[in-house]
Amino acid sequence: MKDLTERQRKVLLFIEEFIEKNGYPPSVREIARRFRITPRGALLHLIALEKKGYIERKNGKPRALRISKSIRNKIPLIGEIRAGEKREAIEYLEDYIEIPESFLSSGYDHFLLKVKGESMIEEHICDGDLVLVRRQDWAQNGDIVAAMVDGEVTLKKFYQRGDTVELRPANREMSSMFFRAEKVKILGKVVGVFRKL
C-alpha cells in the first residue's frame, strides 16, 4: 500500500468498512460526502485505486465496485497499541500486510496493531511486534485482547469476575488494572503475533 496517497488509503478503508457494515459498496456521492470533496474528486480516487489494483469497477453502473481479490488477505495495519499503561488509541491506516489465510478466522474481520511496550513479554509479545486481532466485542477469561477504557486502548489478558474486569499484563513487574465491566469495550482478540528477525 505504499504506492497510495494518504487520501487514497482513507478512501479504500472507507470502502471496506462501508461494505462490511452495509453489505454493498458506497456510491461515488457517498464517498464524496464522507471526504467533503466533489463527486468528480471521488471518481478520480476510484480510478486511481482501480489502476493500482486495489478495487475493480464496472463503468456506468452505480455501486459497481469491489475490493480486488489480490488484496483480500491483506490486513490493515491501523496503528499502535500500548502493551503497558493504557494510552490514547492511535488509529490511522498505515499499510496493508498480506497474512496467510490459515491465520484468519472465517466470518470475522481482522486488523493489525503494532505493539509498544513490554507488558506482554511473558506471552512472547514484544515491543515492535505486530499482533493480528480478530474483531469481536466479547472475550473469555484468559484471552489476550485489545480493550478500550475511557477512550484509551491497551493490550492485556482479560478476566471478568461478576461486574469487575481485570486487564492483566504478562509481565511480573507490572500490575493488573481493574474496571467496572461497563467501562471496558473489547475491540478484539489477539489471534497471531508477527515479528521481524
Curated annotation (Swiss-Prot):
It catalyses: Hydrolysis of Ala-|-Gly bond in repressor LexA. Residues 28-47 bind DNA. It holds the Pfam family LexA_DNA_bind. It is an enzyme of class 3 (hydrolase). One of its GO terms (cellular component) is protein-DNA complex. Its EC number is 3.4.21.88. The record marks 83-84 as: Cleavage. Gene3D superfamilies: Umud Fragment, subunit A (2.10.109.10), Winged helix-like DNA-binding domain superfamily/Winged helix DNA-binding domain (1.10.10.10). Keywords: Autocatalytic cleavage, DNA damage, DNA repair, DNA replication, DNA-binding, Hydrolase, Repressor, SOS response, Transcription, Transcription regulation. The active site is at 119 (for autocatalytic cleavage activity), 156 (for autocatalytic cleavage activity). GO terms for molecular function: DNA-binding transcription repressor activity; sequence-specific DNA binding; serine-type endopeptidase activity. GO terms for biological process: DNA repair; DNA replication; negative regulation of DNA-templated transcription; proteolysis; SOS response. Represses a number of genes involved in the response to DNA damage (SOS response), including recA and lexA. In the presence of single-stranded DNA, RecA interacts with LexA causing an autocatalytic cleavage which disrupts the DNA-binding part of LexA, leading to derepression of the SOS regulon and eventually DNA repair. PANTHER family: LEXA REPRESSOR, LEXA REPRESSOR-RELATED. Homodimer. Belongs to the peptidase S24 family. No consensus sequence similar to the SOS-box from E.coli or from B.subtilis was found upstream of the lexA gene, suggesting the presence of another target sequence specific for the Thermotogales. This is LexA repressor. It comes from Thermotoga maritima (strain ATCC 43589 / DSM 3109 / JCM 10099 / NBRC 100826 / MSB8). The gene is lexA.
